[in-house]
């Protein structure tokens, strides 16, 4: 029994597949790819021919081939981030795969990069203008919780430099600081929280001063 065809991509949403067989094009417009290649499908508006990219080349792929002879990769960004596969992640970014997508546990790709200690992957994701720093997963954890719990102080510092929030509590009512497993992570988080508290107090004092001047 043949499996049902994949759902068409929403406008602007890139769907990703892994080719199970090699495809030999018959016309110059068609895209050649080999077994195991990653296919980025960007346009499914034509029911017969989908527009896709593979290894930096763009062309047409018969939609029935994708349906019958390709494997859907639901969360390519997450897979790349978990493995610390920088080149695949960069390819996902270049092919406009959404960077803030959530897996079944509510995690972003950045969460998995922080959880795995993949500093180069974290850096690439943090350089994307639309990256979400404060997304909570189903356990209420943020990327900062993950990095602090795993003891990656260099990643904690990178997240704090991008102004990741330190005041978010997870489902166990714990801050990232309370999840920190080494002194260096704890010190960075304390310093950042101290700065935020000082700034808040300073703002409050200015507000009171304004009241007094009325």
Curated annotation (Swiss-Prot):
Q: Show where the SH3 domain sits.
A: 12-71
A Pfam family found in this protein is: Ank_4
Q: In which tissues is it expressed?
A: Ubiquitously expressed.
Question: GO annotations under biological process?
Answer: signal transduction
Cellular component annotations (GO), alphabetically ordered: cytoplasm
The record's annotation in InterPro entries points to:
Ankyrin_rpt, Ankyrin_rpt-contain_sf, SH3-like_dom_sf, SH3_domain
Q: Which UniProt keywords apply?
A: ANK repeat, Cytoplasm, Repeat, SH3 domain
* Location in or out of the cell: Cytoplasm
Spans of repeat ANK: 72-101, 105-135, 139-168
Q: What is its main location?
A: cytoplasm
Protein's job = Induces bone resorption, acting probably through a signaling cascade which results in the secretion of factor(s) enhancing osteoclast formation and activity.
Q: What is this protein called?
A: Osteoclast-stimulating factor 1
Naturally occurring in which organism (per UniProt): Monopterus albus (Swamp eel)
């Amino acid at each position: 029994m043949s499996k049902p065809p994949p759902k068409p991509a929403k406008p602007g949403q890139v769907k990703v597949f892994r080719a199970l067989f090699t495809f030999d094009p018959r016309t110059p417009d068609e895209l050649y790819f080999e077994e195991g290649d990653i296919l980025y499908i960007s346009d499914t508006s034509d029911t017969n021919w989908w527009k896709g990219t593979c290894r930096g080349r763009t062309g047409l792929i018969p939609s029935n081939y994708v349906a019958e002879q390709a494997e859907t990769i639901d969360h390519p960004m997450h897979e790349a981030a978990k493995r610390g596969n920088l080149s695949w992640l960069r390819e996902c970014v270049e092919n406009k795969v959404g960077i803030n997508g959530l897996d079944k546990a509510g995690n972003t790709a950045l969460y998995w990069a922080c959880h795995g200690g993949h500093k180069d992957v974290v850096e690439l994701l943090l350089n994307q203008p639309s990256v979400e720093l404060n997304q909570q997963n189903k356990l209420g954890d943020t990327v900062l919780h993950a990095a602090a719990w795993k003891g990656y102080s260099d990643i904690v510092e990178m997240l704090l430099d991008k102004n990741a929030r330190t005041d978010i509590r997870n489902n166990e009512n714990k801050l990232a600081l309370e999840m920190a497993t080494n002194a260096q992570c704890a010190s960075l988080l304390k310093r950042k929280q101290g700065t935020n508290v000082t700034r808040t107090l300073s703002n409050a004092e200015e507000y009171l001063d304004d009241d007094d001047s009325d």
